[in-house]
From Swiss-Prot:
Assigned protein family: Belongs to the complex I subunit 1 family.
Name of the molecule in the record: NADH-ubiquinone oxidoreductase chain 1
Single GO BP term: aerobic respiration
Keyword DNA damage: no
Cell location: Mitochondrion inner membrane
Any Pfam family matching the protein: NADHdh
Lineage, highest ranks first: Eukaryota, Metazoa, Ecdysozoa, Arthropoda, Crustacea
Catalytic activity: a ubiquinone + NADH + 5 H(+)(in) = a ubiquinol + NAD(+) + 4 H(+)(out)
Keywords from the UniProt entry: Electron transport, Membrane, Mitochondrion, Mitochondrion inner membrane, NAD, Respiratory chain, Translocase, Transmembrane, Transmembrane helix, Transport, Ubiquinone
Top-rank taxon, per record: Eukaryota
Residues passing through the membrane, by range: 45-65
Molecular function in Gene Ontology: NADH dehydrogenase (ubiquinone) activity
Organism listed in the record: Artemia salina
Cellular component terms per the entry's GO annotation: mitochondrial inner membrane
EC class of the enzyme, as a word: translocase
Length: 130
């Protein structure tokens, strides 16, 4: 950590070190100075790729764990899950996402106007598959 010369360990340089410091030989050619600074940037890519690898391993582990711990679905249970549960949830997502945008519209029916929960009657019917 101390070799990175970052905030806890960045030592103040004196005036003699500014004119005759360790960076003096790199100031005449910018290629050498750029190579020194680019060598420190590889740590960011190593850190990013290691975090990406850890996340990838966690996803693969959770996938394999769920496959190994749950029993196989019967075909009729799978069809019930897809058609009765997932299908209704997937098609209700746009209804609930667009509900805040439709709240400013006035209802023209005088019997439904200003009645509580009148806007959610259609959502309940859609959710029940009616």
């Amino acid at each position: 950590l101390a070799e990175t010369n970052r905030t806890p360990f960045d030592l103040a340089e004196g005036e003699c070190q500014v004119s005759v410091g360790f960076n003096t030989e790199y100031m005449h050619s910018s290629v050498g100075f750029a190579l020194i600074m680019l060598s420190e940037s590889e740590y960011a890519s190593i850190l990013f790729m290691s975090l990406f690898s850890v996340m990838f391993c966690l996803v693969v582990y959770s996938y394999l764990w769920s496959r190994g711990s749950y029993p196989r679905y019967r075909y009729d249970n799978l069809m019930h899950l897809c058609w009765k549960t997932s299908f209704t949830y997937i098609f209700n997502i746009p209804v609930f996402l667009l509900k805040p945008f439709s709240s400013g519209l006035k209802n023209k029916d005088p019997w439904l106007y200003n009645q509580p929960y009148s806007a959610f009657k259609t959502d309940a019917l859609i959710g029940q598959g009616v």
